[in-house]
Every structure is written in C-alpha cells, then in structure tokens.
Amino acid sequence: WIAESQMMKETEDVVHMTLDFLPLKSYANITEGNALRVDWESVVPKHELSYIMGNPPFVGYSFQSKSQKDDILSVYVDEKGKSYKSSGKIDYVSGWYFKAAQLMQGTGIRTAFVSTNSITQGEQVAGVWKPLYERFGIHIDFAHRTFRWDSEASIKAHVHCVIVGFSNEPNPAPKRIYTTERYQEVENINPYLLDAPNVFIDSRTNSICNVPQMVYGNKPTD
C-alpha cells in the first residue's frame, strides 16, 4: 500500500490530475513478529516459495541493542546449537542471510537482500559468510557493489548499501557484478563481491611473519 500510494502520487504529479488507485488485488498475508525469532516455514511452506527478497534493518554491530545482539546470537549457531565465535561482531542484517540460507536447503529458492556494505568488508566477511558457504553450500549469483542509499523519506538514511543475490542450487544464468553505471559478467563472485576465488580472511592473534607486536591498531567500525 505504501509503494502504491507513492507511485500514484508521482503519477498525479506527472499528469496533473487526481487518479483513483490502481485495480491491484490485495492479499492479507502479512505476519507481524520478530523475523529473527519466527520460524519462517511456519509463515509459508518453503516448497511453495520461489524467491525471498527484502530490505532488512540497517544496524551495525556497534550500535545494536542488547535484544538485537541476542537475536543474532540465537540465529548464528552451529549444528550443535552453539553460537559462532564471530556472532557478536556482525551486522544485524546478517541474521536474515542465515535464516534464508537455512530455509533454502533442498529447494530452488533464490534470495536477494539490500544490505549494509560492511558485511562484504573486513573481518565481518568471514564471520557472516563462512558459515553460509561451509554449512549451507550457498553461492552468490549476482551483486551490486556499494551505492549510497537515497530514500524518499523526510529523514534521509545515511548508509551505503550492497545488493546480494544468492542460492544453493545450480544457476545457469551468468554471474554479474553491477555498479551504478555498468555490469560485468564474471566466473565467480566471492563474499567480498570480487571476481575471485572464495577465500575468507579470518582474524588472527599471531603474525604470519617476523614483525613487531601490535598492541592496538587502527579500528574503523560501523
């Protein structure tokens, strides 16, 4: 309804007249709840789905409330139900990737999310994506690299985003990396949104070469 109303207003501005709402059929299939606590298959059976699309909340791990951190810790768990070591240092949007990857198992569902770009940068990459690749066997089908989020709301959202499409079934379509002006067909898209092998750079406490010990380095965080 919100999108329909926005588009109708823009159309009225173009044609300079008042219009009736488009004859779109409405379905009352909205479920209210915490998406990271709800069993998604209790909302809709996964074998009835073809696509999952969304724009999950943008909350960097440094700005999450206690309840949001608890949400992530409850979602990002291994096969034994234990939270992954990195679960406390990943953005809130990551929970939607994990829930989608779980639901997609044994299906041909394809998923795409608009997300904070930090999940494709730095140490978050291994924390977010390594469980998805190793446990659920997902692969990235297409990606739009970082772009500035420009909403039409009165209070603008000052965030930089990416769009990532992924699945765990073979996809014959060409893999594409998009930027604002163009796209590139590639052999593989890794979690850093590069045309390169799927390599994860984990954080480590010991140096890989003979250099002085670093006590505390530069720390850009979101």
What are these regions (language model features)?
Residues A28:
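Short, conserved active-site loop motifs that form the nucleotide-linked donor/cofactor pocket
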Residues W1-E12, H16-D20, L24-K25, A35-D222:
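Signature of N6-adenine DNA methyltransferases within the class I
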Residues T31-E32:
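Conserved residues in the N-terminal Rossmann fold of short-chain dehydrogenase/reductase
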